[in-house]
Amino acid sequence: MTRNLKKIPIIILAGGKGERFESKDDLPKQLAKVSNHPIIIEIILYYFKNGFNFFILPLGYRKKSFIKFFLNKNNIKKYKFNILKDTNLKFDNAKINILFFDAGINSNKLSRIYKCFKYLKNVNLFGVCYGDIFANIIFKKQLSLLNNKNASAILAGYNENSPFGHIKVKNNKILRFNEKPKIKEPINIGFYFFKKEIFFKIKIRKKDDFETNFLPKLSKRKVLFYHMHNGYHLTVTTQKDLAHIKKLYNKNKNFFKKL
């Protein structure tokens, strides 16, 4: 099945506090520059390059910084933004369509997603990503998994290296030492696609969390599938992570273009 990617909105979860990041200025983590562009823009540009052009930001913490950035006339011109108003969704297929709204500073991820449905009335399929993870996902391959009639959701999995050396022991003797081996079970790196209908088939409690409660409920129903990603995967959790990615970029100015 061939899908028109421009009709698939992408929700970017960028309203959290990012407490481990320890921002050196008053900007939220997602607006920290990782190249010539902020983190969130590199993520948006990757999606845009791959055919998506509608992005929804349910804002919360430091929302004024995001609003200031996206409404800046220079940024609108530089990135070809088309800023959408919730009362007048006039899309421009040649531009990056951005819609943001205040989802509440204390809203968790799952609540933020549900609050986006106000703007997804005629949408059956949408994507979700985090505002601090880079990966060169092949989205068309990932989306093809939704052709399975039992699939209602797809997430990207990744075999990451352990941060520690692993040892095999017998009778207190070390038989084998593996320096930072690949972890056998893939980790969830986000980059989701959902059929909207599944959100109305799952019983949700008010305080339920996206990863802790909602995804396990999908798994129990056997409707959550995963796409194994074998390319890049970089997460910005701390200033050290940001410095590492900046170093990669400074070594190769085309780093993000190759993603």
Model-derived features with residue positions:
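Conserved beta-strand scaffold positions in the cores of enzyme catalytic domains, especially
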Residues: 31, 98-100, 153, 224-226, ...
